[in-house]
Amino acid sequence: QLKYKVEFANQASGSIPAYLPIVNIDTDMIIPKQFLKTIKRTGLGKNLFFEMRYDVNGNKISDFILNKDPYTSAKILIAGKNFGCGSSREHAPWALLDFGITCVISSSYADIFYNNCFKNGILPITISEDQIKQISDYSNRKEKISINLPDQKIVFGNNEIKFEIDEFKKKCLMEGLDDIALSLEKSDKIVSFEEKLKSTKPWIFND
């Protein structure tokens, strides 16, 4: 099961969100191609938004949002519209998660990136541009906001914004289920199907 289960099974304790108001951030901007050789999900966080976070000498750019306190430990990213466009590389959500980001808030996403987020334990919330402005204005005060997945709402100060989410995707996040865990939930049916297949089509199982 995925490591984010505990966090999303309860109301998130809260995080000061990092606001990155750039539209059309593609997956190559999230994690450049030179870091895609690995098939491990760990170790990519240090290269998240590499070309925006570091100069040509590899030094951190001090005024980039994720290089400034308190955003160096941000769990929530508020992003511009069409976030995650471009190629379908799954390394993009891997890099976000390895950095520590478990929730992205935007007005729109590329479809493949959006679905890859759920598969990797990141909650991508879609709300309107006006609502984005509300939250970003609040976040500029360096105040924490909370994500309440059970009740599907973003809580900031005395305000809250409701968001929509597919029930099945919500279940997977709440229960920490990835593709393997979902398959294991149906292990009895899988075994039963294989036994039936062995009796009706035994040649499939011949060495």
Region roles according to the model:
Residues Q1-D207:
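Fe-S-dependent hydro-lyases/dehydratases of central metabolism
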